[in-house]
Curated annotation (Swiss-Prot):
Gene Ontology molecular function: ATP binding; phosphoribosylamine-glycine ligase activity; phosphoribosylformylglycinamidine cyclo-ligase activity
Keywords assigned: ATP-binding, Cytoplasm, Ligase, Nucleotide-binding, Purine biosynthesis
Localization of this protein: Cytoplasm
Tree of life domain: Bacteria
EC number annotated for this UniProt entry: 6.3.3.1
Pfam families: AIRS, AIRS_C
Protein name: Phosphoribosylformylglycinamidine cyclo-ligase
């Protein structure tokens, strides 16, 4: 028995792994940007930081996955956008620190290497990288029979960006009186899906619920996470933003306080939050307390900015999209987030 056959009998298909690499090359090529060194397939991805033109560079890194949203992608056999979710979760975190994404690496683990399916996953990663302006410079595809079922896979990503040292956003500039501006989310994004799956456990995904404006449930649930990089970078370059909060797991309650000091609080006007229909559906069909929704989901605001009042108009001008004035920064009395 050859070594190859022995490995195949243990459940690992080396040839399928080679096929995946060949299939994804064209998708990786879409993400090329200045600074990338070397070709796909090396032991390590290389990037020339001098190509960024940043005078005092500070590297900012982030890693994340997409949680159990993956289980819906597997259930509905829609694998082409879940990679964008993975990129978004990472790059939106580092843009919140004032960093421009430079490069990205992905990690896919599966029970059985299916080249066509994994190509779809990586194509989604590449699309996310294009939207973020980041190069996909490396990754790993691990076939792990016995660890995962044949149809199962997990996905994680790693983003590295650069910030000008003087433009780092760390919460120190947020002050009482700052205006809170909300940027719209595209949907649920990539958190809260353990609850979402419970709420819709008995649904096929093909339903068109009255709350969802004619869309099938599965399409709304798998709507890819918005990537905010290209919208927000110009604001950072002009130093118009004092704080940024990426609204992920924990919703408003956990994420908004991460962008300011402990002696401050956020006062949110609920009537000004552009709540998306899917959140009304989740609340209704899941019989969830209204206030708890803000502790779990983004509620229609995926990124929140703290901006000095005199800069609000310029920020709106640069964003060129609907911007929601949903609150302000106040002195903390009790809670870090007050929803009125």
């Amino acid at each position: 028995m050859s070594e190859k056959n022995a490995y195949a009998k243990s459940g690992v298909d080396v040839e399928a792994g080679y096929e995946v690499v060949e299939r994804i090359k064209k998708h990786v090529a879409r993400t090329e940007r200045a600074g990338v060194m070397g070709a796909l397939g090396g032991f390590g991805g290389m990037f020339d930081l001098s190509k960024t033109g940043v005078r005092e560079p500070v590297l900012v890194s982030g890693t994340d996955g997409v949680g159990t949203k993956l289980m819906l992608a597997i259930k509905y056999q829609q694998h082409d956008t879940i990679g964008q979710d993975c990129v978004a979760m990472c790059v939106n975190d580092i843009i919140a620190a004032g960093a421009e994404p430079l490069y990205f690496l992905d990690y896919v683990a599966t029970g059985k290497n299916e080249p066509a399916k994994l190509e779809q996953v990586v194509a989604g990663v590449a699309e996310g990288c294009v939207q973020a302006g980041a190069a996909l410079i490396g990754g790993e595809t691990a076939e792990m029979p016995g660890m995962y079922g044949e149809d199962d896979y997990d996905l994680a990503g790693f983003a590295v960006g650069v910030a000008e040292k003087s433009q780092i956003i760390d919460g120190s500039k947020v002050k009482e009186g700052d205006i809170l501006l909300g940027l719209a989310s595209s949907g649920i994004h990539s958190n809260g899906y353990s609850l979402v799956r419970r709420v819709f456990a008995d649904y096929t995904g093909n339903e068109v619920l009255p709350e969802l404006e004619g869309k099938q449930l599965k399409d709304v649930l798998l709507e890819p996470t918005r990537i905010y990089v290209k919208a927000v970078l110009p604001l950072i370059k002009e130093e118009l933003v004092n704080g940024i909060a990426h609204i992920t797991g924990g919703g408003f309650i956990e994420n908004v306080p991460r962008m300011f000091a402990d002696d401050l609080a956020a006062e949110i006007d609920e009537d000004k939050v552009p709540v998306l229909p899917i959140f009304n559906a989740i609340e209704k069909y899941g019989d969830i307390k209204h206030e708890e929704m803000f502790e779990i989901f983004n509620m229609g605001v995926g990124l929140m900015l703290a901006v000095s009042p005199e800069n609000v108009n310029r920020v709106k001008e640069l964003l060129d999209e609907p911007v929601y004035e949903i609150g302000r920064i106040i002195k903390k009395a009790d809670d870090s987030v007050v929803i009125k």
